[in-house]
Each structure stands twice: as C-alpha cells, then as structure tokens.
Amino acid sequence: MEFNVLFISILLVVSAVSAVVGYLVRKSIAEAKISSAEHAAKQIVEDAKREAEAGKKEAILEVKDEVHKLRTEAEREIRERRNEIQKQENRLVQKEEILDRKSETLDKKEESLDKREESLTKKQRQIEEMDSKVEEILNKQQVELERISGFSREEAREVIRAEVEQEMAHETALLIKERVAKAKEEADKKAREILSLAIQRCSADHVAETTVSVVNLPNDEMKGRIIGREGRNIRALETLTGIDLIIDDTPEAVILSGFDPIRREIARTALEKLVQDGRIHPARIEEMVDKARREVDEAIREYGEQTTFEMGIHGLHPDLIKILGRLKFRTSYGQNVLKHSMEVAYLAGLMAAELGEDVKLARRAGLLHDIGKAIDHEVEGSHVEIGVELATKYKEHPVVINAIASHHGDTEATSIISSLVAAADALSAARPGARRETLETYIRRLEKLEEISESFDGVEKTYAIQAGREVRIMVKPDIVDDVLAHKLARDITKKIEEELDYPGHIRVTVIRETRAVEYAK
C-alpha cells in the first residue's frame, strides 16, 4: 500500500515538471519567432529603403502592419498556451487533492483493520480459554455423573439408546395403528361404493313364493268328479303326488298344498290336464301324473339351461344343470332360490368387475352357492355340505367350491371371490321384499326393539326404522352427556344381542341434541 502511494506521488511530480518545462519551451519558441520576425522586418525596411525611396512610407506601413499581425498572432498563441497550461495545472492540483484524500482514507481503513485484527485475536484467545475451561468443567461433571449414577459413559449411552428405541417403537406402533385404521376406513368406504354401485345396477323382483297352488275349474261340478266315488280319485291323486288337495267353498278352484314345490307342480300340471280331458279315474290319474312328471323334469332341465345361458356360464355338467333347474321350485323364506342364486351371481360379477377379479368365475360361484338346496330334502346334511359334495363330484373350480363352503361362514374364505359371493348372498337376502316374514312376527320384533331401547334411563324417544334394521334413540341432554351417549349405545347393543332374535345386523344410533333458544324483544 505504501509503495502505491509513493508511486502516485512521483507520477504527480513528474507531470508537474513536464508541464512547466513545456511552458518554458513554448515561451522561448514564441520569443524566438518574435525576434526573427523583427529581424526580418528590419531587413525588409532596409531593403525597402534601398530599393525604393519613393515607396518608403508605404513599405514602412506594410512592414509595421505585418509586424503588428505577427505580434498579435504570437501573443494570442502565447495566451492560448498559457491557458491550456493553467488548466492542466488545475487538473493536476485536483488529482493531487483526490489522491491525498484517498491516501488518508486508506490510512484510516488500514488503521481500522489493524484494530479489528487485534480485537479478533484477543477474542480468539478468550474463546480458546473459555473452551478449555468448559472442557475441564464437562470432564469434571462427567466424572461426577458417572460416580453418582453408577454408569459409565458407554453404559449411559446404551441406556439412552434403549429408551429412545422403546419410544420410537411406541411411536411406530401408534403410526402403524393410525395407518391401519385409515386403510380400514378407506377399504370400508370403497366397499360401500362397490356395494352401492352393484345394488344400483341390479334390477331384481320382489318375490313372494307360497306353499300352495291354485287350479281353476270350469265349474263347481268338476269338484265332485275330482273327488270321485267314495273319494277314490282324490286319494289316488294325493297318493301319487304326495300333495294335499283342498276342496272347499272357494268357487271354481281347487287348492294344492305341499312344501315340495316340484311335487306341487307335478300335481298342478296333472290336475289341469285331467280337468281339460274330462276323464278322471284312478288309471287316467296315474297316466297323467307320469306324463306331468316327465314334463316337469324336462322343464327343470330347460330352466337350468336357460339360467346358464342368461348368466353367460358355460361348461357346467349336464347333471349339475338339471340340479340347478330344480332350484326354480325351491323357496327360502318365500324367496325363490333360483332367482336368488341368479341375483347373487349378478351382484358378485358386478363387484368382481369393480375389483378387477374374474367376472365369469365370480358369477359361476354365485350361481352355484346354494346348489345344495335343490336336493337337501333328499340327502342328509346341510345345503352347504351337499353343495360342496356336488361341486367336488362334478370337478368345479376350487374357488367355486370354497365359495360354496364359506358363504355362511362355516369355512374360511380363501379368495376374494368367495368373500364377494358371501356379501352378494347377504345383499340379496336382506334387500326389501326379498324374503317374507309374518306381519305379526315383524311388528312384535319392532315393538321389542323399541321396548329394549326405552328401558334405559335418560332415553326420551325411540324409533325403529328401515324394517327393524336400525333403531334411533333420542336422549335427554341434561341427563346423558357425550361420554354416556357412547356407553348407552354399547349397552343397548349388548341387550339387543342377548334378548332379541333378528336376521342380519341392527344399527343403534344414539342422538343427543342441545338447543339454546332466546327471543329478541
């Protein structure tokens, strides 16, 4: 830095000396020119005097004019040079002042930097001293802590690590629980969406199958011919078909009563043919019953084939198709089993499509899930066991066999399709109008449901809705708070499970409402 200041000072001195020397040189040149001009003028004058005395005055004037011009020009040039030199001197002075100020600033900065460096050095020494003191104190504290706790440093580290691991394990468990709960919630939501979509897309009938059939007669005189002499005709018909004929005051009608729909259909077909033919006697009755039995067997096969065609299911064994057709004449709680099986197959296929599963396999499993009901009155065992035996005998797919075995929860479901079939079975059976119960039983169940709910303290009103599948309980807010509302719901649910028989599930909803009313006057 000192070298730069010295160099700038020398440069300024050299510039000033050069300016002065230039000025002196220019002044000497100007004076030389003036002297030369004067000498030339004198020479001219002398020459003029010698050459022409006549024009002496004019020559003298001309010379004087020339001398005056030369002098004027020389003086002007001198003034310009002098002004220029003065300007250069002024600029040099300004630059010198600027350099002086910069030099002072640099000196001040250098002095400030020196002070700061000295201060930083001092602080660094202080920090180093403090670090050494802190390290000494920490070492003493560590020794004291080890003495008090009875743990060495490594042992304490292991204890802390174990505590941290335990805490992290707890937090991880909570996180996993939260994620699992969220996953279940999302799965339930998705399941509800799939079930809702399947139900909306499924158009099913409201069935009401009965255990009696009615045969219309052309007139009441036909009743006597059906009974026959000493009742031989009616006895023959009842013996051959196993169906009771009820002939009462109902005009122009005979009622066929029996719990086997196939036998009832055979009796109905045979009786209609006898009435149409008009020849009614035991031999003719036996002939018509045999013919009706063959026709019903053929109709059963056609029902099975038509069902598989409508559902788009191929490759079923012919015997299995015939057994499937028998479901047309079977009912469960008033619901036609074949229609129920078709409905289950359709629902299972819709839900399988939503989940990306095999739709045809799901429909096949749904259609055959109740196949055992076709012959459960002829073979020992539950319809589930019989269905599994039939499916195994006719070499059905393992998924179909598992769906039949698990649709009532008797066996664990090993595939998604089995779970879908069970869900579709519950949907088909639980939908409004699918199955029938007596009005008296239904009303008694609803009354019992409301009675159980109203037996608890704090209950204000109780409403059984959705055909007894939900009960809504209004409680008194000044007696039952939010915490007791949850407990009340659990207690009512437990009592319903203990005292009431019901199909499916019953939803218990406890509603606590607080109203604040004021009047503006």
Swiss-Prot record:
Keywords annotated in UniProt: Cell membrane, Endonuclease, Hydrolase, Membrane, Nuclease, RNA-binding, Transmembrane, Transmembrane helix
Membrane topology annotation: Single-pass membrane protein
GO cellular component, one term: plasma membrane
Documented EC number(s): 3.1.-.-
Molecular function GO terms recorded: RNA binding; RNA endonuclease activity
Region (Disordered): 105-124
Known role: Endoribonuclease that initiates mRNA decay.
Compartments (UniProt record): Cell membrane
Record-annotated HD domain positions: 337-430
Enzyme class of the recorded protein, top EC level: hydrolase
CDD domains linked to this entry: HDc, KH-I_RNaseY
Xref: Pfam families: HD, KH_1, RNase_Y_N
Database matches in InterPro entries: HD/PDEase_dom, HD_domain, HDIG_dom, KH_dom, KH_dom_type_1, KH_dom_type_1_sf, Ribonuclease_Y, RNase_Y_N
SUPFAM superfamilies: Eukaryotic type KH-domain (KH-domain type I), HD-domain/PDEase-like
Full protein name: Ribonuclease Y
Transmembrane segments: 5-25
Domain KH: 211-274
Family note: Belongs to the RNase Y family.
Any one GO biological process: mRNA catabolic process
